[in-house]
Design a protein with these regions (language model features):
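Alpha-helical secondary-structure segments
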Residues: 1-77, 81, 96-100, 127-137, ...
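Short, solvent-exposed loop/beta-turn-alpha elements that line the ligand-binding surface or hinge
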Residues: 2-26, 68-106, 120-123, 178-184, ...
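Extracytoplasmic/secreted cell-surface and envelope-processing proteins
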Residues: 8-11, 46, 140-143, 173-176, ...
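Solvent-exposed, polar/charged alpha-helical surfaces in well-ordered, non-transmembrane soluble domains
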Residues: 29, 33, 37, 42, ...
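Bilobed periplasmic-binding protein-like "clamshell/Venus-flytrap" ligand-binding domains
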Residues: 45-49, 114-137, 238-288, 345
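Ligand/substrate-recognition segments at binding pockets and active sites
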Residues: 53, 86-198, 254, 335
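Ligand-binding clamshell of periplasmic/extracellular solute-binding protein-like
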Residues: 188-207, 277-280
């Protein structure tokens, strides 16, 4: 979500009033939450994976839910424990991967109703027009953006919110998203052109990226690069900075460290400044003759990538779903033992 858009080279907005209305709306937390609850992530993922496999790629929070664990709880559960303190809309929300724990049209309508009342008092003009650029050469991504448009407009009503899709060449798309030289060149309201992969096994590898001082990343994720901008103050991002900094200072108690990072993630989820949809790990169906889980596995770094071949074992027959599921169950058991040992060893080294 772009909280401080400055350029309108690719827009369907017809006047300054519409530009101001959109910017004001995106600075309203209830409005952003309405968008988050209105996105059907399963249908979004199904544009790549098909209807049957749509849920496999769904992600609900920025940090991978099982990225770290402590005392039998994974990171996602720690976040779920803290979210209800931000409001009743978070009660019962499931943040685990491979299921859509956020899509809820009724919650979307409720949050939007609160937002609309406040925004109308500020003179905001409806419907809110949201510019969404997409690389026209990627048919799957175009379909995914169209699925977001359908679910959001269906949940909130076209008289309230309209997503204007702009199909651009690859160069034009990259120049206003991935490759934009600064925040001023980020020419969008909503973008599907952002992603992040962890570099090391600590929540900070995700959460540090969105601190207000990380301008190279905040320009792409939220459309600003000035940590002291009015938009940053309006949405309260300095509070997020403080939560992340507090967590980073906890170096003696691993459980306390993870709990503090979970608090920062809970704040981020409630803020709805970043709306996760899918993970690259939930890919489309493939034909494989690689023995399931024979290769290296890593939550961070490059050893878990598809380009790391050490330990891989091949087989003559194509891997079946039955074989994969059986191997997965065995792997989960072994991983639980390994994780428990690793967490105990790591706790001894945290200084």
């Amino acid at each position: 979500i772009n909280i401080d858009r400055q350029t309108y080279g690719h827009t369907s907005k017809e006047n300054d009033q519409q530009k101001t209305s959109t910017k004001t709306a995106l600075l309203n937390k209830d409005f952003r939450q309405a968008l988050g609850f209105a996105i059907d992530r399963t249908n979004y993922a199904a544009q790549l994976n098909g209807k049957e496999g749509g849920s496999t790629a769904v992600r609900n929070i920025y940090v991978k839910p099982d990225f770290v664990q402590s005392d039998g709880k994974d990171f996602g559960t720690m976040v779920m424990d803290q979210l209800p303190s931000y409001g009743d809309e978070w009660s019962g929300v499931n943040l685990a991967d491979s299921q859509d724990g956020l899509y809820n049209p009724e919650k979307a309508k409720a949050e939007f109703a609160k937002a609309k009342e406040a925004l109308q008092a500020e003179g905001v003009q409806f419907p809110i027009h949201l510019d969404v650029p997409v690389n026209q050469s990627s048919k799957i991504t175009v379909n995914q953006v169209q699925s977001i448009k359908q679910s959001v407009e269906s949940a909130l009503g076209k008289d309230n919110v309209v997503l204007d899709i702009h199909q651009l060449s690859a160069d034009d798309f990259n120049n206003i998203t991935y490759s934009a030289p600064n925040a001023a060149a980020e020419d969008w309201d909503l973008s599907v052109g952002v992603a992040w992969e962890p570099d090391y096994l600590d929540p900070s590898t995700y959460l540090d990226v969105l601190k207000t001082t990380s301008s190279e990343n905040t320009k792409s994720f939220m459309g600003y690069d000035d940590p002291n901008s009015q938009a940053v103050e309006k949405v309260g991002l300095k509070e997020y900075d403080q939560l992340v900094d507090d967590a980073s200072k906890e170096t003696t108690d691993l459980k306390a460290r993870y709990e503090k990072y979970a608090k920062a993630q809970a704040w981020l989820t409630d803020s709805a400044l970043y709306l996760p949809t899918t993970t690259y790990n939930g890919a489309a169906a493939v034909i494989s003759r690689i023995k399931p889980f024979s290769g290296a596995y890593a939550q961070a770094g490059d050893k878990g990538s598809s380009y790391y071949f050490k330990y891989l074992k091949s087989q003559d027959d194509i891997v079946t779903k039955k074989q994969y599921d059986s191997a997965y169950k065995d792997w989960l058991k072994e991983r639980a033992k390994s994780n428990d040992k690793a967490q105990k060893d790591l706790a001894k080294h945290v200084k």
